[in-house]
Amino acid sequence: MTKGILGKKVGMTQIFTESGELIPVTVVEATPNVVLQVKTVETDGYEAIQVGYQDKREVLSNKPAKGHVAKANTAPKRFIKEFKNVELGEYEVGKEIKVDVFQAGDVVDVTGTTKGKGFQGAIKRHGQSRGPMSHGSRYHRRPGSMGPVAPNRVFKNKRLAGRMGGDRVTIQNLEVVKVDVERNVILIKGNIPGAKKSLITIKSAVKAK
């Protein structure tokens, strides 16, 4: 069954194991998420739980949103997300989901929004090779051939310059190194997408090895 939690990326650091091995880790702060709704097949057509993360001011919420969170006896939430394929019997409206849903050694999938890089060329955006930089060359960082002459057009999905970053990306099969319940912190091995303070979704790995 799937377990999941929403959190905030704090940054990267490194820790040492008992054997002296250095492990780079990403620190994710996940304050308690609140279950706002439990969806069932009878009422909604599918099974899922809806969780809210990070309080926001009531003046920024409309009446339907306030009424929705009032059932869970909590404040309006800035981020709301559903997790499917969960054990519904373990959840009820108003229950808090804390970082202890995961343990050290668990394998998880982490989703975040990558850093926006703005308008970039084909070399930086797609990793293409550049031309010779020596004297006499007129081809340095250009995109190269746009395609054959015959169709008289540029095919769709041709790798050209454009906006880079700001994409929703999931990295699979990352290991949970440590869980600090007192500080509401999860340490995940390696790097994860997104800038500092960005929203991160952590859930059980779909393709766990």
Swiss-Prot record:
Pfam families: Ribosomal_L3. GO terms for biological process: translation. One of its GO terms (molecular function) is rRNA binding. SUPFAM superfamilies: Translation proteins (SSF50447). Residues 118-151 are annotated as: Disordered. One of its GO terms (cellular component) is cytosolic large ribosomal subunit. Keywords: Ribonucleoprotein, Ribosomal protein, RNA-binding, rRNA-binding. Part of the 50S ribosomal subunit. Forms a cluster with proteins L14 and L19. One of the primary rRNA binding proteins, it binds directly near the 3'-end of the 23S rRNA, where it nucleates assembly of the 50S subunit. Belongs to the universal ribosomal protein uL3 family. This is Large ribosomal subunit protein uL3. It comes from Enterococcus faecalis (strain ATCC 700802 / V583). The gene is rplC.
